[in-house]
UniProtKB/Swiss-Prot annotation:
Residues on Extracellular side: 26-451
Alphabetical UniProt keywords: ATP-binding, Cell membrane, Differentiation, Disulfide bond, Glycoprotein, Host cell receptor for virus entry, Host-virus interaction, Immunity, Immunoglobulin domain, Innate immunity, Kinase, Membrane, Nucleotide-binding, Oncogene, Phosphoprotein, Proto-oncogene, Receptor, Repeat, Signal, Transferase, Transmembrane, Transmembrane helix, Tyrosine-protein kinase, Ubl conjugation
Residues with Phosphoserine modification: 884
Location in the cell: Cell membrane
Gene from which the chain derives: AXL
Originating species: Homo sapiens (Human)
Record PTM Phosphotyrosine, positions in chain: 703, 779, 821, 866
Signals that turn on the gene: (Microbial infection) Up-regulated by Aedes aegypti lymphotoxin beta receptor inhibitor during Zika virus infection.
Gene Ontology cellular-component terms listed: actin cytoskeleton; cell surface; extracellular exosome; extracellular space; intracellular membrane-bounded organelle; plasma membrane; receptor complex
E.C. code: 2.7.10.1
Protein name: Tyrosine-protein kinase receptor UFO
Amino acid sequence: MAWRCPRMGRVPLAWCLALCGWACMAPRGTQAEESPFVGNPGNITGARGLTGTLRCQLQVQGEPPEVHWLRDGQILELADSTQTQVPLGEDEQDDWIVVSQLRITSLQLSDTGQYQCLVFLGHQTFVSQPGYVGLEGLPYFLEEPEDRTVAANTPFNLSCQAQGPPEPVDLLWLQDAVPLATAPGHGPQRSLHVPGLNKTSSFSCEAHNAKGVTTSRTATITVLPQQPRNLHLVSRQPTELEVAWTPGLSGIYPLTHCTLQAVLSDDGMGIQAGEPDPPEEPLTSQASVPPHQLRLGSLHPHTPYHIRVACTSSQGPSSWTHWLPVETPEGVPLGPPENISATRNGSQAFVHWQEPRAPLQGTLLGYRLAYQGQDTPEVLMDIGLRQEVTLELQGDGSVSNLTVCVAAYTAAGDGPWSLPVPLEAWRPGQAQPVHQLVKEPSTPAFSWPWWYVLLGAVVAAACVLILALFLVHRRKKETRYGEVFEPTVERGELVVRYRVRKSYSRRTTEATLNSLGISEELKEKLRDVMVDRHKVALGKTLGEGEFGAVMEGQLNQDDSILKVAVKTMKIAICTRSELEDFLSEAVCMKEFDHPNVMRLIGVCFQGSERESFPAPVVILPFMKHGDLHSFLLYSRLGDQPVYLPTQMLVKFMADIASGMEYLSTKRFIHRDLAARNCMLNENMSVCVADFGLSKKIYNGDYYRQGRIAKMPVKWIAIESLADRVYTSKSDVWSFGVTMWEIATRGQTPYPGVENSEIYDYLRQGNRLKQPADCLDGLYALMSRCWELNPQDRPSFTELREDLENTLKALPPAQEPDEILYVNMDEGGGYPEPPGAAGGADPPTQPDPKDSCSCLTAAEVHPAGRYVLCPSTTPSPAQPADRGSPAAPGQEDGA
């Protein structure tokens, strides 16, 4: 009889031969009513995470049945089982050997129990003998203590929970590595009540069972000061409030300072509703303690405020107190009334004035008027809230050199008096003026000189109106035709003059939006984004590339002229959907508000005769120090190299991480993060730029794959190169390359590796190597950004925090007396392998002391690279080899 193995796909040949050999010795003629099982499941006992296999074997006659697995009497529907069938004869009606295996991966408590095999033969059901799976090992933690902050001497609870088997599991708590009990308790103490701490401590718990001991993570409990108490007002001034408070306990850590915040009550309505933070930026002051008292200045008089205080120790700040409503008192007006006029008409003197332009510092209650003649005492009047008064002249006597002064007053007192305003001198024998308030006559009594003034004003206004209408009419013609056609006869011919320079397209923003054919909803959002094109004046070109140019410009605003950077695009928008996407993104970018993110000033369009839609023009703030890559490059390779300390480089990295953290919280993906797309403002802070609307204007760093648009392959993440998928994690990859650029002072990544070879180079596991003089911690952070799995890369929040901590740990930067760049390995350098300084480790450098003991080496470069030394006389350019750095402005073209 010939034996054959069925086609079982993945069944090993050795296993098949073993079954066939067993079948040759197996007894024949098994009774149908007898159990067909010839092998039953065994027992498995192990620790958590163990991998094991259960097996049962049966011999049947005829078509082999399907074997089911039971756990505690229940069929396992999703069991990881395999079934192998081996015939014992050539006929399908002969006996079969059936082997079923159940694989248990990563043993857990839920996998324990009684296991059996189940088969159905005809109308009978057969169940194998049981096998048992048990779990025994070290205790496993279900809950561990967590880090937290608590106020000094404030009770709190910690939780810890573990399980076996084997049971029981006893817990032992430790504080600062010292057990809180001499031995484990009689039962698991899952919750630990701590009555209070006066210093920062660490807590952990140990779980004990028959197999051994497992220790939980260590939780750090940071002790912060208690919330200050009894915040109250000590004294009030119109622009100052003096407040005091009682400090809370701070444990063994003395308070270093307290912070007081004040916010306007009118703008902080949410405060009264219990909001923990004010809706606007509060006015903040710090005070060294003791004493626990602070004078808060620069406030508005007669204004309600809410104030709160928090105190800080070396461990951190306390919680804020509840908001306390306070109000500054009224003050006197800061200035006198304006535009005082004093005129006489017959027997009446008219005095008129306007409200003070200076702040009133309270509620205006009225005005006081004082007048005095040369030989008469001063007369003081309370006018109330009126802004004019009539003095009736009557009686006998004489008055000369009469002057009038006016002052405003509030509940706090009188403000400053105005300068004396003289009345026309009265002739002797004329009546002496005595004051009385009279009602304004129903018909104003004007003298003849007033009529002349009124008539002259009407005539002047009419002339101005006629001239304006004429100029508007003439301007319409010039705008439409360039210049009015003026027929003049010269030698019998008609001459037409045309002035092109006086023809402008001054369409308003409304007209521009209407001409684009976009939706009304988008049009409404664009009111604050669009800028009239004629308000932008272009200057010199700052940079130009394949897709457009960046030019210096000026934006004419209502009351000033703003220096801006203007990006013009050579690629026009072809469809209305592209136009709406462009404008929608502009609306989104206009709302960005972060010190490390380049903000968008506005967008305008310039018409094109060859395109159906106008070309976009992006208006951005002008950055004094230009882009970060050029700054780094010139600091290393310029005519006068500049020393950049490590502290400044880490600050650049932290600024970029902060800006990208903000963009990622806005769910905004940059897609082109690099040093060339980061700008330096006048404060040497880095702003992330060239995202969204900014078409790329650089050439060398972009590689076109087929018809796909150019991509910056040396900065782009590996998954984006493969699938064109961009996420915030792909921006993290680009940030790591940008960190490498900063650490190398502007070198090009992967020198010697072509753009078309980058993907294969990365797929082989290659990454940028650690630059010279780069901190190990910084390079470790870069390497985390280049993890193959995007989920393993850090977030921008983690990157920012790590960089800020690194910056704090560095010593203060020190400027060297003189920085000299030299070639540290003269005479026969080693050829650089592909990716040198970014693909392979540089060769060993000789000791700088052996070359020149009087030089201060600022950087050590790989062999064969040219560097610059300060020189008072110009020297001829040296020939650059393949390993030498590119000239400024060319190094990007990898």
